């Protein structure tokens, strides 16, 4: 009640799980900011997982493009979000509620991974009345995505290389543990490796800030085939 006005919770029509795009700073995590997605999903129960590596798990490395792990993380968040709603809301979901998952960029890859999880775990799909996913512009196949980056030979989003490699080395030590970053990156990159590592590990820098730093310090070639915001 506020100024003699009584507010009532409105029963959500469905659960919408929103998978966020690529972030590198903890301040951008859904639990640490005010995501605009909450304003555009309508009369729904909106649940946005931070992913491992942000929020309460900031001290852990983020498994970037490890879709299977991020999907499991999201399913856990779905259950936790619903439990919180059930505890604090003065209403219930509408009787014919369903669940969908949406996302773009990294969130698109994770949204599709959640859909695959539901397809292969029908007991979860039944409990959550899973209806559909909307996955946009996502790296659905990380290895093919990286292959296409290399085919193009240049990028305006250079952080994707170290971010992906660091994640994969941490996620699959049995496969990639025999390699070191020193074997995979240029001398120019290795000269500022400590700075780059700090920018990722501190979780204090946005993707824009990290990309700017990489472009500024590693862009050693300028020619007519490169725009101002691209790097080989």
Predicted region positions:
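Short, surface-exposed "cap/lid" segments of acyl-processing enzymes
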Residues: 2-42, 58
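Surface-exposed acidic, glycine-flexible loop patches that form ligand/cofactor-binding
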Residues: 2-11, 36, 84-95, 122-127
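Short beta-to-alpha linker loops that shape the active-site pocket of alpha/beta-hydrolase fold enzymes
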Residues: 22, 50-54
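Alpha/beta-hydrolase active-site loop
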Residues: 64-88, 115-116
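Glycine-rich nucleophile elbow surrounding the catalytic serine of serine-hydrolase chemistry
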Residues: 72, 103-116
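Alpha/beta-hydrolase fold nucleophile elbow
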Residues: 89-106, 129-131
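A conserved short beta-strand
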Residues: 124-140
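Accessory cap/linker subdomain of secreted extracellular hydrolases
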Residues: 136-231
């Amino acid at each position: 009640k506020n100024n003699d006005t009584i507010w009532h919770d409105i029963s959500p029509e469905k659960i919408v799980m929103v998978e966020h795009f690529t972030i590198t700073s903890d301040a951008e995590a859904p639990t640490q900011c005010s995501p605009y997605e909450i304003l555009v999903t309508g009369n729904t129960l909106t649940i946005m997982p931070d992913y491992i590596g942000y929020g309460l798990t900031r001290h852990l490395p983020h498994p970037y493009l490890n879709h299977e792990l991020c999907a499991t993380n999201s399913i856990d968040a779905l259950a936790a979000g619903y439990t919180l709603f059930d505890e604090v809301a003065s209403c219930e979901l509408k009787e014919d509620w369903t669940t969908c998952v949406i996302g773009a960029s990294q969130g698109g890859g994770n949204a599709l991974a959640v859909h695959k999880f539901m397809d292969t775990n029908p007991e979860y799909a039944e409990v959550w009345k899973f209806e559909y996913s909307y996955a946009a512009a996502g790296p659905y196949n990380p290895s093919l995505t990286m292959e296409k980056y290399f085919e193009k030979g240049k990028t305006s989003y250079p952080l994707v290389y170290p971010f992906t490699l660091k994640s994969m080395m941490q996620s699959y030590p049995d496969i990639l543990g025999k390699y070191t970053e020193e074997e995979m990156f240029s001398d120019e990159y290795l000269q500022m490796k400590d700075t780059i590592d700090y920018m990722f590990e501190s979780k204090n820098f946005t993707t824009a800030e990290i990309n700017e730093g990489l472009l500024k310090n590693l862009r050693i070639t300028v020619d007519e085939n490169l725009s101002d915001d691209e790097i080989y």
